[in-house]
Amino acid sequence: MTQSSTNSFFTVNDLPMSKRYDVWQSSIDCIFNVETLPDIRKNTFHATLDADLLGSMMLARTNSTHQFWERSSHTIAADGMDHYILQLYYSGGVTSDYGKDGQEIAPDGLLFQDLSQTTKATTSDFDNLVFVIPRPLLEDRLTLPEDHNMRFLSPRDPMVRVVANLMRSLKANASALKTEHAHVLENSFADMLAACLNSAYGETSDTTNKRQNIEVMTMIRRYFRENFSRPDLTPERAARELGISRSKLYQLLEEHGGVYRYTRDLRLRRAKQLLSTTTKRPRSLYDVALECGFSSDTSFIRAFRETFDMTPGDFRRNQQTALKNSNGADGEGRDTRYEKWLHSL
């Protein structure tokens, strides 16, 4: 099967049954830890993943058997990915005891996940479509961007049905869409998905007030994204330059853990990007620390270890290993480019 530069087709179905699950598990652990039942592993396991790049998003249709899926804090620390994921099922389904607005996906419903947060779910035998959405594409459109992990979206909402139909159409036409089309479509898709998520709460006085603050929050997120690397960034300076009171700044960032934690998390996210970059001469931890706004490599290493339970050096080594294992094909010529795409979105 000939593949374009924006399509990756991965399958284990051509392998002996005894090897299929291990090869699949080794590949998909670039994003999830998976397990299945011994009988399935021994007798009936199969898996294919057909992925397309569309602008900055990845669209992947996967067909496989019953499995248990987990994204642990260790996995999050190891891979540094913070994308959003949206799932639609052609057949089969997914359940989770940790779901919001439900524990099981409805026919034509959707499941939204945040890769920066832990996840546990179970799928039946399934055929699904997954959109991997880079955080910057969607985050500023959401009222509460950290509050939707494992949110089940009901097809009773007409906007959910519209988004589901658009997902099917985009996947069906991905190979024919031009770059300029992709840019327009991904932004339209993000707007429609944000409308679904922002209306998922139901109206209360609390959520109405939060929605009234969305423009201010968008301004705050943009400001911190542009200024987090300044070592002299303080709540007082940020409030003054944003033109809001310090108490208002603290209030709006309370759900993000406060001003200092929000700033630290942005710095650590940028540090992960720098540590993931492959160069002939890796940058020193001191240089990475200063570029990200930390006062010293000591404070950087301490913050990284406290947050991710590993050192920046350990993270960089894990990233180098992951990239070597996803360089385009495995030892048998299997197409694993989708793994690299996940790390580089």
Q: What is the predicted function of each stretch?
A:
Residues I301:
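DNA-recognition helix of C2H2 zinc fingers
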Residues G55-M57, S64-E70, H74-T95:
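Glycine- and acidic-residue-biased ligand/ion/polar-headgroup-sensing regions
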Residues M1-T48, M57, G93-R246, L253-Y260, ...:
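Alpha-helical bundle regulatory/interaction domains
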